[in-house]
């Protein structure tokens, strides 16, 4: 996601969204904040039209760039969908329902540290996707959003590899749109 906006623009967007700058990259939180502040800034509701215009410009650039980045990643036959940015996108958590906690990781911490070839937990699937992306693009994953695996999350946000960081990552994954993860084929679709 670092490729989407300059540092100054990222800070400006997060300020316009009225959420902490540390939340940059938390797409679910950013999307929810966008919906809330759009009502606040909308000129028809007495808001600031200049802020609304700038918010739309920056947020649209994030959307377009992220879609382009994700369309080049992974091995699933699914495409990144524009409907992620719509209101009723289907999240991984909603899709897996009560099985989310058992499907997110097969064996903690083993799956976070090693690729388990026969494991189909989300951690291992995303780790395999990460390896495929690196192989296909002949470069490492450089930004959060190009890859959603746990290791890239740790590197991108600078978090330690511990259970607390893992739980925060699982919360992001629970609220992540299935099409953004590009795991349709791997999940049996």
Curated annotation (Swiss-Prot):
Transmembrane segments: none annotated. A zinc finger (H1C3-type) spans 130-152. Its main location: host cell. A zinc finger (C4-type) spans 111-124. Residues 12-75 form the J domain. Gene3D superfamilies: DnaJ domain, Small t-antigen, unique domain. Disulfide bonds: none annotated. It comes from the Viruses. It is found in: Host cytoplasm; Host nucleus. SUPFAM superfamilies: Chaperone J-domain (SSF46565), T-antigen specific domain-like (SSF161240). This is Small t antigen. Keywords: Acetylation, Activator, Early protein, Host cytoplasm, Host nucleus, Host-virus interaction, Metal-binding, Oncogene, Phosphoprotein, Transcription, Transcription regulation, Zinc, Zinc-finger. Promotes efficient viral genome replication by accelerating both G1 and S phase progression of the cell cycle. Inhibits host PP2A by binding to the A subunit, thereby displacing lower affinity regulatory B subunit. Inactivation of PP2A in turn results in the transactivation of cyclin A and cyclin D1 promoters. Late during the infection cycle, ST may induce dephosphorylation of host MTOR, leading to the inhibition of cap-dependent translation. May establish and maintain high levels of viral genomes during persistent infection in cell culture. Pfam families: Papo_T_antigen. The modification N-acetylmethionine is found at residue 1. One of its GO terms (molecular function) is zinc ion binding. The common region of ST and LT proteins comprises the J domain. This domain is essential for multiple viral activities, including virion assembly, viral DNA replication, transformation and transcriptional activation. This domain is also required for cyclin A-transactivating activity of ST. GO terms for cellular component: host cell cytoplasm; host cell nucleus. Interacts with host PPP2R1A; the interaction inhibits PP2A activity. CDD domains: DnaJ.
